[in-house]
Amino acid sequence: MIFCLGAYTGAVSDAELRTISVDYTVEFARVLRLSSSPDAAFSFLSGNGADPTGRSRIPFARYKGEAEKTLLEAGFSRVYLFRPAYIYPVESRKEPNFSYRLMRAIYPAFRLLFPNQVIRADDLARAMVDVAIRRTGERGGQVFENRDIRALVEAQPPLRDRAA
């Protein structure tokens, strides 16, 4: 199972951010665990800076970390935690705030200068699907930081007709 649900920090209240980041994730995992094979895997879109210790002052990091910790304790045979940094949207969209508009504008330079701090949305999706399909024999939890996600993508054959 691949689970990707979240909200922009600042777009919702702190309580809503926790509900979306933790409560929905945990409830979905609980239902999935009860109704799926004992060998089921759970791939979770977390985020750069997620803090499973709960000590972060940043709500996003604290909540994603809490969800990660709960998933690792939920009894799945395999849990894959993906922690991308800035996710570059490959489709046009209305950016939610100035910082997202700025990142979109400087992405080409940022990608060259700090490649381990950015990932294209389609590359992230490819990596998550690849891990979910191919990592069937491994047990336990595994964290994929942004550089690990990029390495997974670079190990795959290139996609055709792709911009940026």
Question: Which positions does each model-derived feature cover?
Answer:
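SDR active-site strand-loop-helix element
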Residues: 4-5, 42-48, 82-84
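C-terminal accessory extensions appended to soluble enzyme cores
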Residues: 160-164
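Residue-level signal for alpha-helix termini/capping positions
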Residues: 33-37, 133
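Alpha-helix N-cap/loop-to-helix boundary motif
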Residues: 13-24, 51-63
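Oxidoreductase cofactor-interface core, primarily capturing Rossmann-like NAD(P)-dependent enzymes
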Residues: 52-159
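A short helix->loop->beta-strand "cap" motif at the edges of active sites that frequently abuts
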Residues: 36-40, 76
